[in-house]
């Protein structure tokens, strides 16, 4: 072999050279060391051939992986190179075990061989006087070396050896798995045992005896695979190997060991033929002629002679055939080597071993025992390589490669909301600048053309996206709150990324290049307007993740679960194109296989305008006037753009539409410019040259340059100078073809960070349209500075009208895109148009296809349907197969989905119209797909040609059938292929029973494999009669080989022992009972109970004929089955014994999925139920299909949601299942007699997809992909709503200025009481009024009242204080409106959300605000009041208490109450009687308030109860009100509380309550009213009976009646109490100026100053309903800045949500914090979809604790995935 040192100089004729390639794979540690070494050497420029070999081998491996079905491909982790693949040690235990070992062996041996020869100091390993010897997989590497006369030859030969190693491993695994499936658990089992001290004859004789005695089927028989001096190796399926050794007296006691051969069977002609070898090497990419010359002979391990092949392909085929079928006879190899050494008369043999040379021990001994001893020098090259230190690396230059752009999308000014609308704008030459819109800021207040107003803009112009607030939050799983706080740049990056991915036909993990772990996201962004100005006005939860730049790409990664790199880049104006370059570099470096890149810019901050104006960047006269004589600066613009990119070879392999390719891209810096913002022509020209040189493209071949072209005199002139210098020079070599230039900024302004991506998308559209749009920047005349650059000699042109874009060189258009940065950076990209795509026009002959449309909402679903219909109306020539391929294999699918089968585009349009009209009927599919049951048909469904279309058009299906047919023949059975292929159907006789039964079995096994490739695998299986055999295979009970063996043997035994056609079978449409009643004692047997009214009977033909006559006479339908025997009848008896004996040789495994047994009428899970006797019984006994399904249904294995797939040639079982399980929603066939297979499948696949099953649609279309084209269909129809935080005021102008403090205004009303201190607003209009006041809890009177009601040693405003406030405001407003005294006042629906807790130490004001609205036009007239906290002078947007006052007639109330007085008085009398009898507790005053101290410490003024009687939850009290005067009150709390707080005494003092562990507090009442005023010193009686609220655990309510002299004069209606753990008391009631204590059950939650202590959310409205007239619904109080509130849920939803108050509170909180509608919180709504992310979870967990009193972890929203699961959790845990 020629090496850096010529072999002629180094070969020693006194040596005989032997190179040995071992079959032993090194240890994992050594493999890692070898791989690391090869990786390091490949990066060294001194090992170029190694690098090329590794690259070629990687590509070869990728080519093979692309051929794999998805279920196999998913097992392989993404990899950058073949070295990464070899590191995947875990693959060795699965279907890729043999492949990975073979690939690793070849890789290490060949890589080491190449690197060894690339070192100039090493002697060549081979020579003309040498021989190659190898064992096992080492033969593949040796074969490559054999024909590599030059080292570069080994690149191609070696990479093909890698391919063959991979393919052979897969073939061996497939063949071996048909013989015996691998164990699901436990260590791998050996397929080979080696015996020493036994001769080959002894072993062969013993094997023949044992194979026969154990009745092993031919394919599974044990055989001799290798013979060497002193040892014999036998091979076979592991279970049979063990059985044979245990059963053999000779072998059991011999000396033997199992070999580490775990990946299947080789060296046997039982399992393989020459066709297997031919198929394995068929994929090789080697010339058929002899372009390679044999360099060194390779010895066969079968006979020791050199392989006689004359071409590498022939040699590889011979090697593969030997590995698969040949017995290793190493003694012949040793003999040949001995003879060759002797012939050369050399004294020395040099053995270079690539791997452990243990196998050469016999050769060494033979040559040394010769009469003239020969010295043998052995060197392990692999071991020596590891021992040699790595040289200092000489780095290799980066590798250039074409990058394909396969998708794009944009949102650009001028209404460019799509790629097409952007092109329309360009084509028309529009200039879309306009005045700054109001949604950004008020241009009139923020614009000053004179520049006198600080911080104001000097220009009112810009180019803007139409309504950037629009966004589909639900699609991207964002809550409305998160969407509102998220920068619209980030939101539109998500939107355009999705649209670009759609155009690219992206489906996660569809191909190796779309593996989500290998997808990266890159976006350029140079400003933070929305975060700084809009969201910064009111900083919320999502201020950081919604506005920080890193979250723009990060959010895309997170949403799509992309595991690749994520970068946000800021290079000022060049951010987006520089980002695209970084993304390309990532692809070139192999760090990702697909990237999404783009740029974003949305302008909302006036500061940017002001700063750029002051920096002299901006024009004040309109848009960018690029190249115009009057160019005076640029015009700012919005812009969002995204592109999807892959390496070109991946895009071609993925059948993508390629928009253009990137040949080269680079960035440099204008470091030598006069200032940082000034351009530099030399730097720009240098960059262009570098880009062109890297790509190897002549600059004169470029026909279009998209310039940066901002419209500044200096910038445009400098760029034009650099462009003409390189692309249109004036030197001796000039352009012969025109160069056009353009600049998109003249249309849509300067998008800054998005400028580059806008320019790139423009050029991509030019490629698509093959046209150059007109330039619109020159408004007056060409700038005089630029005229010299546009000399005719340069042949450079500006298009002023639409111009065809013609190719310049080799029919290829090259374009350059420039994007420069104000910070000095220059980025340039070279583009080439996409390669021509070749489509096979006649490759897809399917008649019927599935078309699907889906969305995440009904609105979007309808929009998608309408858009697709419009597309088809505009494009009637659309190919149906392309449409099906695009909508299924190249689309992501969502939960609102429609799928249907169609045979024409007209049919599709008809279906679309139907579904548009009925889209409301579509229900979203469940998040968890339904279980799938497979039913396997029996013999009665047979017909010739079944499965023929699948067999002819799906290679994987054909392979399965072919291999199964091979197994049939290996077992000695006839071939099934003539039946499948339907060869000679017209002349052929009816197939023999064995053929029909084998065909059905093999077909159903192959169909199961095919369904698995489509992503559909059974969770349970059932088979009818013959169908039970493929069912057992599908469940993993039987291997494919054993299944075929049993079916064939059963057929042979029946043929041997039973008379053909002597018996018959008949299906009867009747139950077993009805048949019995009809036939009486007439002879027949029940064979199958298929359905309640479907039974099969059998017997002698005459008996069946007689039975038929009787049954039909009774009106029963009968059908004679066309079967050769009466299965499941006594006719089977003669064959049963022999069949059972045969079946006993088969290995039965535990089911991997449950097996529904029609024999047992039960479900089988274990390994002991199915055995040889079971197979005997299943042959003879009835098939009870009904009983089996009932048993499965009873234990929950199947239910009405289970989807049934009938895996058979014709739907027979579908009707049986429907009759047994009428509620089943979906049953689909696979094939149907007299119908094209694809038509049947189309209908079934459409149904399965509609049910929510995840289908591998790419596998459906894979056989036809070469003839299919990805359509550019309309993008997703968004369900958009506006999410926008409007910038308010002019604070960006005034920031930094000293703000004068406002002077407190005088009160606007004279109203002042102890509870209301300052009226801020009082407006009366007709019969309505609004009122705003503030009160100070530290006011002496109010503080005394609150401090007299102490809880947890804190003063807490009692509900009676809120009552006085309501009485006061209601009375005052009524008088103001009517100038008359107020009538009766009823305070209804008092709801206190948080307790008002007084400060403990601080003497500062503790303010709260009161807002009221009175409306006397309603009936009844009302005043609505809300209470708000005030912190640092700012009123909270959320109220903490509310009430509705209703005005009524006190006399009417008294009249109503008189009817109740006798009932209340009778209950009081009853309590008094019980007290006298000792049955009720009598509580004197001190005792009563001592019990109150369990929770509340009342001041003396409140202690009005003089005595009380209590029995469980019923009580009465005698009350005397205080005579102490204190303050100005309307209804003093010292009066209201004593007559009402008897209810609190019952709840917190009764023996019936657990007051040790719990306390009870009231969040409010339904009504409080007094028909007569309470008076100082007055004597009253109170009565109450508290009862639990039905359906609301932990809640009680009751009516407190207030009596005076036996007359009811007041009522507290439905005062409600709720139970809480006592441990939460410190959490709920702590002063705002004291940190809350830590507590085991209630972790501390920080409290805002002046905020009231949290009290649980009030009981729902249901708890407050009473017999009183209904109150008006609460009306929100006015607020200066109204907070966004959730709309109330519909009535039905409201009722469902209010069943439990805790759950109601939780849902209210979730809705409020997420800005969702309550109606959206349905039980099946997923929190991830609603946008409840980790941040929102933290907020909600805190709110749950502080406001609901329930402590949950923030992870609860991941553990409970849906609203329904959370409600269940709360109910079970806290209620």
From Swiss-Prot:
<feature type="active site" description="For beta-ketoacyl synthase activity">
    <location>
        <position position="750"/>
    </location>
</feature>
<dbReference type="InterPro" id="IPR020806">
    <property type="entry name" value="PKS_PP-bd"/>
</dbReference>
<dbReference type="GO" id="GO:0031177">
    <property type="term" value="F:phosphopantetheine binding"/>
</dbReference>
<dbReference type="InterPro" id="IPR001227">
    <property type="entry name" value="Ac_transferase_dom_sf"/>
</dbReference>
<feature type="region of interest" description="C-terminal hotdog fold">
    <location>
        <begin position="1480"/>
        <end position="1626"/>
    </location>
</feature>
<keyword id="KW-0596">Phosphopantetheine</keyword>
<dbReference type="Pfam" id="PF16073">
    <property type="entry name" value="SAT"/>
</dbReference>
<feature type="domain" description="Starter acyltransferase (SAT)">
    <location>
        <begin position="35"/>
        <end position="262"/>
    </location>
</feature>
<dbReference type="InterPro" id="IPR009081">
    <property type="entry name" value="PP-bd_ACP"/>
</dbReference>
<dbReference type="InterPro" id="IPR050091">
    <property type="entry name" value="PKS_NRPS_Biosynth_Enz"/>
</dbReference>
<dbReference type="Pfam" id="PF00550">
    <property type="entry name" value="PP-binding"/>
</dbReference>
<dbReference type="InterPro" id="IPR020841">
    <property type="entry name" value="PKS_Beta-ketoAc_synthase_dom"/>
</dbReference>
<dbReference type="InterPro" id="IPR014043">
    <property type="entry name" value="Acyl_transferase_dom"/>
</dbReference>
<keyword id="KW-0808">Transferase</keyword>
<feature type="active site" description="Proton acceptor; for dehydratase activity">
    <location>
        <position position="1349"/>
    </location>
</feature>
<feature type="compositionally biased region" description="Low complexity">
    <location>
        <begin position="1688"/>
        <end position="1697"/>
    </location>
</feature>
<dbReference type="InterPro" id="IPR016039">
    <property type="entry name" value="Thiolase-like"/>
</dbReference>
<dbReference type="Pfam" id="PF02801">
    <property type="entry name" value="Ketoacyl-synt_C"/>
</dbReference>
<dbReference type="GO" id="GO:0006633">
    <property type="term" value="P:fatty acid biosynthetic process"/>
</dbReference>
<dbReference type="InterPro" id="IPR036736">
    <property type="entry name" value="ACP-like_sf"/>
</dbReference>
<feature type="region of interest" description="N-terminal hotdog fold">
    <location>
        <begin position="1317"/>
        <end position="1451"/>
    </location>
</feature>
<feature type="domain" description="PKS/mFAS DH">
    <location>
        <begin position="1317"/>
        <end position="1626"/>
    </location>
</feature>
<dbReference type="InterPro" id="IPR016036">
    <property type="entry name" value="Malonyl_transacylase_ACP-bd"/>
</dbReference>
<feature type="region of interest" description="Disordered">
    <location>
        <begin position="1671"/>
        <end position="1697"/>
    </location>
</feature>
<comment type="pathway">
    <text>Secondary metabolite biosynthesis.</text>
</comment>
<dbReference type="GO" id="GO:0044550">
    <property type="term" value="P:secondary metabolite biosynthetic process"/>
</dbReference>
<keyword id="KW-0511">Multifunctional enzyme</keyword>
<dbReference type="GO" id="GO:0004312">
    <property type="term" value="F:fatty acid synthase activity"/>
</dbReference>
<feature type="active site" description="For beta-ketoacyl synthase activity">
    <location>
        <position position="708"/>
    </location>
</feature>
<protein>
    <recommendedName>
        <fullName>Atrochrysone carboxylic acid synthase</fullName>
        <ecNumber>2.3.1.-</ecNumber>
    </recommendedName>
</protein>
<dbReference type="Pfam" id="PF22621">
    <property type="entry name" value="CurL-like_PKS_C"/>
</dbReference>
<comment type="function">
    <text>Non-reducing polyketide synthase; part of the gene cluster that mediates the biosynthesis of physcion, a natural anthraquinone fungicide that can prevent plant fungal infections. The pathway begins with the polyketide synthase AcPKS that condenses 8 malonyl-CoA units to synthesize atrochrysone thioester which is released from the synthase by the atrochrysone carboxyl ACP thioesterase AcTE that breaks the thioester bond and leads to free atrochrysone carboxylic acid. Spontaneous decarboxylation of atrochrysone carboxylic acid leads to the formation of atrochrysone.</text>
</comment>
<dbReference type="InterPro" id="IPR014031">
    <property type="entry name" value="Ketoacyl_synth_C"/>
</dbReference>
<dbReference type="InterPro" id="IPR032088">
    <property type="entry name" value="SAT"/>
</dbReference>
<dbReference type="Pfam" id="PF00698">
    <property type="entry name" value="Acyl_transf_1"/>
</dbReference>
<feature type="region of interest" description="Product template (PT) domain">
    <location>
        <begin position="1313"/>
        <end position="1631"/>
    </location>
</feature>
<dbReference type="InterPro" id="IPR030918">
    <property type="entry name" value="PT_fungal_PKS"/>
</dbReference>
<feature type="domain" description="Carrier">
    <location>
        <begin position="1697"/>
        <end position="1774"/>
    </location>
</feature>
<feature type="modified residue" description="O-(pantetheine 4'-phosphoryl)serine">
    <location>
        <position position="1734"/>
    </location>
</feature>
<dbReference type="InterPro" id="IPR049900">
    <property type="entry name" value="PKS_mFAS_DH"/>
</dbReference>
<feature type="domain" description="Ketosynthase family 3 (KS3)">
    <location>
        <begin position="400"/>
        <end position="833"/>
    </location>
</feature>
<feature type="active site" description="Proton donor; for dehydratase activity">
    <location>
        <position position="1537"/>
    </location>
</feature>
């Amino acid at each position: 072999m020629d090496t850096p040192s010529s072999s002629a100089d180094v070969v020693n004729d006194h040596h005989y050279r032997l190179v040995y390639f071992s079959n032993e794979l090194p240890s994992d540690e050594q493999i890692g060391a070898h791989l690391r070494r090869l990786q390091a050497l490949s990066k060294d420029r001194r090992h170029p051939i190694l690098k090329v070999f590794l690259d070629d081998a990687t590509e070869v491996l990728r080519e093979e992986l692309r051929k794999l079905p998805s279920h196999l491909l998913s097992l392989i982790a993404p990899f950058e190179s073949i070295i990464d693949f070899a590191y995947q040690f875990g693959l060795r235990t699965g279907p890729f075990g043999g492949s990975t070992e073979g690939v690793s062996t070849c890789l290490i041996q060949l890589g080491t061989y190449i690197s060894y020869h690339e070192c100039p100091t090493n002697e060549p390993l081979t020579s003309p006087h040498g021989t190659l010897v190898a064992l096992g997989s080492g033969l593949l590497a040796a074969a490559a070396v054999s024909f590599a006369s030059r080292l570069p030859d080994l690149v191609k030969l070696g990479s093909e050896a890698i391919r063959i190693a991979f393919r052979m491993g897969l073939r061996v695994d497939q063949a071996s798995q048909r013989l015996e499936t691998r164990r699901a658990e436990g260590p791998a089992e050996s397929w080979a045992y080696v015996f020493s001290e036994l001769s080959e004859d002894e072993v062969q004789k013993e094997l023949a005896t044992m194979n026969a005695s154990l009745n092993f089927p031919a394919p599974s028989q044990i055989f001799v695979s290798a013979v060497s001096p002193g040892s014999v190796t036998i091979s076979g399926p592991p279970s049979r190997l063990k059985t044979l050794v245990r059963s053999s007296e000779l072998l059991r006691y011999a000396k033997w060991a199992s070999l580490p051969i775990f990946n299947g069977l080789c060296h046997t002609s039982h399992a393989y033929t020459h066709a297997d070898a031919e198929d394995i090497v068929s994929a090789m990419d080697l010339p058929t002629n002899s372009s390679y010359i044999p360099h060194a002979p390779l010895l066969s391990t079968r006979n020791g002679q050199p392989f006689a092949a004359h071409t590498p392909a022939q040699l590889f085929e011979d090697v593969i055939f030997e590995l698969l079928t040949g017995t290793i006879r190493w003694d012949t190899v040793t003999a040949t080597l001995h003879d060759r050494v002797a012939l050369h008369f050399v004294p020395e043999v040099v053995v270079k071993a690539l791997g452990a040379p243990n196998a050469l021990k016999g050769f060494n001994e033979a040559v040394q025992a010769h009469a003239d001893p020969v010295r043998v020098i052995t060197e392990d090259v692999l071991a020596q390589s590891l021992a040699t230190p790595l040289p200092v690396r000489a780095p290799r230059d980066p590798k250039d490669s074409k990058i394909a752009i396969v998708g794009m999308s944009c949102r650009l000014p001028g209404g460019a909301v799509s790629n097409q609308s952007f092109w329309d704008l360009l084509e028309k030459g529009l200039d879309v600048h306009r005045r700054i819109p109001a949604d950004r800021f008020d241009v009139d207040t923020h614009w000053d053309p004179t520049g006198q107003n600080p911080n104001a803009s000097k220009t009112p112009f810009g180019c803007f996206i139409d309504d950037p607030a629009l966004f589909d939050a639900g699609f991207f799983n964002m809550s409305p709150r998160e969407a509102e706080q998220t920068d619209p740049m980030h939101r539109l990056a998500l939107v355009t990324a999705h649209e670009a991915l759609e155009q690219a036909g992206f489906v996660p993990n569809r191909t190796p290049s779309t593996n989500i772990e290998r997808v990266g996201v890159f976006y350029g962004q140079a400003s933070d307007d929305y975060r700084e100005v809009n969201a910064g006005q009111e900083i919320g939860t999502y201020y950081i993740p919604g506005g920080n730049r890193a979250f723009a790409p990060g959010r895309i990664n997170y949403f799509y679960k992309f595991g690749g790199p994520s970068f946000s880049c800021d290079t000022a104006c060049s951010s987006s194109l520089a980002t695209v370059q970084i993304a390309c570099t990532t692809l070139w470096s192999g760090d990702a296989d697909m990237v999404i890149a783009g740029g974003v810019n949305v302008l909302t901050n006036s500061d940017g305008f002001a700063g750029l104006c002051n920096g002299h960047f901006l024009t004040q006269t309109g848009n960018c006037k690029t190249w115009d004589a009057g160019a005076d600066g640029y015009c700012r613009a919005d812009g969002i753009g995204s592109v999807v990119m892959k390496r070109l070879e991946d895009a071609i392999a993925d059948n993508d539409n390629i928009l253009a390719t990137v040949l080269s891209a680079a960035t440099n810096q204008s470091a030598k410019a006069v200032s940082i913002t000034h351009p530099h022509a030399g730097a720009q020209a240098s960059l262009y040259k570098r880009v062109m040189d890297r790509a190897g493209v002549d600059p004169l071949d470029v026909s279009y340059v998209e310039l940066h072209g901002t419209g500044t005199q200096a910038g445009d002139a400098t760029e034009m100078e650099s462009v003409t210098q390189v692309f249109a020079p004036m030197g001796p070599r000039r352009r012969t073809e025109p160069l056009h230039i353009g600049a998109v900024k003249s249309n849509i302004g300067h998008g800054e960070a998005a400028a580059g991506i806008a320019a790139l998308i423009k050029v991509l559209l030019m490629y698509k349209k093959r046209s150059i749009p007109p330039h619109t920047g020159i408004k007056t005349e060409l700038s005089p500075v630029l005229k010299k650059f546009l000399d005719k000699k340069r042949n450079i042109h500006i298009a002023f009208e639409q111009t065809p874009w013609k190719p310049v060189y080799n029919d290829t258009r090259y374009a350059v895109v420039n994007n420069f940065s104000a910070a000095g950076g220059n980025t340039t990209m070279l583009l080439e148009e996409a390669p021509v795509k070749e489509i096979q026009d006649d490759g897809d002959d399917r008649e019927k296809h599935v078309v699907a449309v889906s969305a995440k909402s009904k609105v979007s679903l309808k929009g998608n349907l309408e858009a697709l219909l419009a597309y088809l109306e505009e494009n009637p020539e659309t190919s149906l197969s392309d449409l099906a391929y695009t909508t299924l294999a190249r689309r992501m699918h969502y939960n609102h989905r429609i799928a249907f089968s169609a045979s024409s585009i007209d049919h599709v349009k008809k279906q679309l119209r139907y579904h548009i009209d009925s889209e409301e009927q579509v229900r979203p599919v469940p998040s968890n797909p339904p279980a799938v049951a497979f039913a396997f048909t029996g013999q009665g469904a047979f017909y010739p040609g079944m499965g023929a279309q699948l067999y002819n058009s799906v290679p994987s299906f054909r392979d399965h059938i072919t291999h199964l047919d091979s197994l049939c023949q290996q077992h000695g059975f006839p071939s099934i292929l003539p039946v499948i292929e339907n060869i000679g159907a017209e002349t052929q006789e009816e197939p023999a029973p064995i053929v029909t039964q084998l065909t059905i079995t093999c077909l159903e096994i192959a169909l199961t494999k095919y369904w698995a490739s489509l992503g559909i695998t059974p969770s349970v299986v059932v088979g009818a009669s013959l169908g039970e055999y493929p069912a057992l295979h599908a469940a993993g009970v039987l291997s494919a080989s054993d299944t075929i063996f049993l079916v064939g043997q059963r057929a042979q035994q029946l043929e041997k022992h039973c008379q053909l056609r002597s018996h018959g079978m008949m299906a009867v449409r009747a139950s077993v009972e009805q048949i019995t009643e009809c036939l009486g004692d007439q002879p027949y047997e029940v064979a199958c109970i298929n359905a309640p009214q479907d039974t099969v009977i059998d017997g002698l033909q005459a008996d069946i004929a007689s039975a038929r006559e009787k049954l039909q006479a009774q009106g029963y339908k009968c059908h004679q089955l066309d079967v050769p025997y009466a299965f499941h009848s006594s006719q089977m008896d003669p064959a049963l014994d022999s069949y059972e004996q045969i079946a006993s040789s088969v290995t039965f495994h535990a089911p991997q999925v449950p097996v529904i047994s029609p024999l047992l009428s039960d479900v089988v899970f274990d390994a002991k139920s199915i055995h040889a006797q079971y197979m005997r019984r299943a042959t003879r006994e009835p098939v009870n299909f009904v009983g089996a399904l009932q048993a499965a249904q009873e234990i929950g294995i199947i239910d009405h949601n289970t989807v049934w797939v009938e895996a058979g040639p014709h739907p027979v079982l579908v009707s049986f299942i429907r009759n047994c399980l009428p509620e089943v929603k979906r049953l689909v066939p696979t094939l149907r007699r007299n119908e094209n297979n694809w038509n049947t499948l189309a209908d079934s696949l459409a149904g399965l997809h509609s049910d929510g099953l995840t289908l591998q649609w790419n596998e459906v279309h894979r056989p036809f992909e070469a003839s299919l084209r990805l359509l550019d269909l309309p993008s997703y129809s968004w369900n958009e709503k506006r999410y926008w935080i409007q910038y308010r005021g002019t604070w960006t102008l005034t920031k930094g200025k000293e703000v004068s403090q406002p002077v407190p205004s005088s009160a606007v009303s004279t109203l002042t009481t102890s509870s209301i201190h300052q009226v801020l607003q009082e407006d009366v209009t007709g019969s309505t009024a609004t009122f705003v006041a503030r009160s100070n809890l530290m006011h002496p009177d109010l503080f005394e009242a609150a401090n007299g009601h102490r809880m947890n040693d804190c003063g807490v405003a009692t509900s009676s204080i809120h009552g006085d406030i309501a009485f006061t405001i209601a009375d005052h407003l009524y008088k103001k409106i009517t100038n008359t005294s107020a009538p009766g006042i009823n305070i209804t629906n008092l709801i206190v959300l948080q307790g008002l807790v007084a400060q403990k130490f601080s003497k500062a004001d503790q303010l709260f605000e009161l807002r009221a609205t009175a409306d006397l036009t309603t009936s009844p007239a009302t005043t609505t009041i809300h209470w708000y906290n005030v912190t640092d002078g700012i009123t909270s947007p959320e109220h903490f208490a509310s009430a509705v006052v209703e005005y009524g007639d006190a006399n009417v109330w008294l009249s109503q109450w008189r009817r109740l007085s006798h009932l209340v008085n009778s209950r009081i009398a009853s309590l008094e009687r019980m007290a006298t009898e000792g049955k009720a507790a009598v509580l004197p005053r001190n005792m009563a308030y001592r019990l109150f101290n369990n929770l509340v410490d009342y001041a003396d003024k409140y202690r009005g109860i003089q005595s009380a009687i209590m029995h469980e939850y019923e009580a009465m009290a005698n009350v005397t009100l205080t005579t102490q005067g204190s303050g100005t009150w309307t209804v003093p709390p010292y009066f209201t509380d004593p007559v009402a707080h008897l209810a609190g005494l019952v709840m917190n003092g009764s023996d019936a309550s657990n007051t040790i562990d719990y306390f009870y507090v009231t969040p409010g009442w339904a009504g409080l009213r007094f028909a007569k005023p309470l008076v100082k010193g007055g004597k009253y009686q109170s009565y109450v009976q508290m009862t639990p609220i039905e359906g609301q655990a932990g809640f009680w309510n009751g009516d407190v009646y207030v009596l005076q002299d036996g007359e009811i004069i007041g009522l507290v209606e439905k005062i409600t109490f709720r139970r809480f753990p006592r441990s939460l008391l410190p959490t709920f009631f702590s002063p705002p100026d004291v940190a809350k204590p830590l507590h085991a059950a209630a972790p501390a939650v920080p409290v805002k100053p002046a905020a009231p202590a949290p009290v649980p959310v009030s009981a729902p409205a249901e708890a407050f309903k009473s017999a009183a007239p209904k109150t008006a619904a609460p009306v929100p109080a006015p607020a200066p800045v109204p907070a966004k509130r959730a709309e109330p849920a519909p009535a039905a939803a409201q009722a469902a949500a209010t069943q439990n108050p805790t759950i109601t509170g939780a849902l209210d909180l979730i809705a409020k914090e997420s800005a969702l509608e309550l109606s959206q919180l349905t039980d099946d709504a997923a929190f991830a979809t609603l946008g409840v992310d980790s941040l929102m979870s933290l907020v909600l967990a805190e709110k749950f604790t502080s406001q609901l009193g329930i402590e949950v972890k923030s992870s609860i929203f991941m553990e409970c995935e849906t609203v329904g699961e959370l409600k269940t959790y709360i109910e079970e845990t806290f209620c």
